[in-house]
């Protein structure tokens, strides 16, 4: 039995060293990340959990984004603005104020990422707005929706 083990180990090592290396492909991951805030089902929600002491910053950034989308020249951006509803939870939550962005109908294949939209619509202000947004957000959750009725 002992004579059998070393040749088997040697064969396994040779086999592993000559086997093709399979690596995860970057494009699917990048594509998934790029579409993280799009809603192929035609409707969706984004939940923003915001630090209670930073709600004014968050709301200021959202107001600026809303203004920029309303003033956009591109028809797609105006469509986004028309169906984008923003809500703030009235319930008190210990760790976060919760904001809900509703997109119904969501423009198919369109990205609703606020950071990307700020960079596109107000490029000279984008970094400062991003810094305020980043400092205010605890986490973001996305939910695609399927219409039942």
Model feature map: region roles:
Residues 7, 40, 61, 90, ...:
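Generic signature of intrinsically disordered, low-complexity segments enriched in small/polar residues
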Residues 7-17:
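Bacterial N-terminal signal peptides
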Residues 18-24:
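Sec/Tat signal peptide C-region and signal peptidase I cleavage site
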Residues 1-4:
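Positively charged n-region of N-terminal signal peptides that target proteins for export
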């Amino acid at each position: 039995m002992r004579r059998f083990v070393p040749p088997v180990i040697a064969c396994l090592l040779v086999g592993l060293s000559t086997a093709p290396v399979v690596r995860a492909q970057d494009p699917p991951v990048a594509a998934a990340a790029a579409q993280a805030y799009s809603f192929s089902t035609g409707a969706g929600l984004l939940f923003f959990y915001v630090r209670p002491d930073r709600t004014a910053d968050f709301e200021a950034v959202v107001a600026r984004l809303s203004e920029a989308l309303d003033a956009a020249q591109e028809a797609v951006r105006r469509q986004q603005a028309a169906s984008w509803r923003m809500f703030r939870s009235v319930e008190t939550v210990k760790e976060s104020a919760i904001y809900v962005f509703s997109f119904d109908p969501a423009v198919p294949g369109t990205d609703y990422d606020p950071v990307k939209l700020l960079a596109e619509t107000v490029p000279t202000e984008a970094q400062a707005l991003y810094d305020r947004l980043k400092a205010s957000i605890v986490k973001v959750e996305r939910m695609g929706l399927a219409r039942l009725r």
